[in-house]
Design a protein with these regions (language model features):
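Mid-to-C-terminal alpha-helical segments outside catalytic/metal-binding sites
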Residues: 1-10, 179-180, 184-191, 200-238
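An N-terminally biased module of ancient metal coordination in phosphate/nucleic-acid-related enzymes
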Residues: 1-25, 30, 210
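Conserved, mostly hydrophobic/aromatic
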Residues: 11, 26, 39, 66, ...
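Active-site metal-binding loops of divalent metal-dependent hydrolases
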Residues: 16, 43, 127, 195-196
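Active-site gating/metal-coordination segments in enzymes
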Residues: 18-105, 112-114, 156-160, 167-168
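A generic "structured core" feature
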Residues: 46, 82-83, 87, 123, ...
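Catalytic pocket-lining loop regions of alpha/beta-barrel enzymes
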Residues: 78-191
């Protein structure tokens, strides 16, 4: 029902809880629902058992990537941790994308993290959650553009409305953030993301999709196709 009438033909389901059981459930849902084209799940990347877990889960063709909720880690250096990075270094062998979930203040450490893995494919989620409700853009924009210099990083356009209060959920207020993202990554490294169902605290799926379509309506049809499906198909090997 959520995507009916939107023209959306397929989605990627992304983890929310950091338990393997949720990854199992997402993979089961993908196998039973044709519109789910892939899963970004959670696995304990810092675990000593991560090699065997990756061997097991990567055998499931629905698994396209993994994500850790780094934004929720109390240790600001977590993303630079030895064990965590050992787990990240194994993903390329299994052709898995790593989705980066952080707050904007974690961008500097994220740049250092990405630099340790030049051959790993990364997708930055929610444009690194800038402080839209505070109308702050400079520091986030500077760090985002620095991260974007790493061509193995793409960026998911999502999560913006939940970072803004009701006054900043208009296209006009969000436009500078869209402009920064398109300047940093270009159409070839941007992906549309809904952040559903989290987005529902601020807007509906269809409303968010319509807003993003309107913002990028001035791009060529080929560029819009890249953002709304071609990049996802290529990056996640759908």
């Amino acid at each position: 029902k959520t995507i009916s009438g939107t023209g959306v033909e397929g989605v990627i389901s992304v983890q929310a809880r950091q338990i393997v059981e949720e990854t199992d459930w997402l993979l089961k849902m993908a196998s039973e629902n044709e519109f789910i084209k892939g899963v970004v799940g959670w696995l304990p990347l810092a675990s000593d058992k991560i090699q065997s877990l990756l061997e097991k889960y990567a055998a499931n063709t629905w698994l396209k990537g993994v994500r850790h909720v780094v934004q929720g880690e109390p240790d600001p250096e977590f993303i630079l941790g030895t064990q965590f990075n050992r787990g990240i270094s194994l993903l390329k062998e299994f052709q898995l994308v790593y989705d980066i979930l952080i707050f904007e203040h974690q961008l500097p450490n994220t740049i250092r993290f990405v630099d340790q893995h030049p051959d790993q494919v990364f997708v930055l989620d929610h444009i690194a959650k800038p402080k839209i409700r505070m109308n702050e853009i400079q520091e986030w924009g500077k760090n985002l553009k620095e991260l974007a210099k790493r061509e193995n990083v793409s960026c998911k356009i999502s999560g913006m409305v939940t970072e803004a209060d009701y006054k900043y959920r208009t296209p006009e207020r969000l436009q500078p953030y869209f402009d920064t993202v398109i300047e940093a990554f270009g159409p070839s490294r941007l992906l549309f993301g809904s952040d559903w169902p989290v987005c529902l605290v601020a807007t509906g799926y269809k409303d968010w999709l319509s807003l993003v379509q309107m913002v990028f309506g001035g791009l060529s049809q080929e560029e819009q196709n890249q953002i709304f499906y071609q990049n996802a198909v290529r990056i996640y090997q759908l």
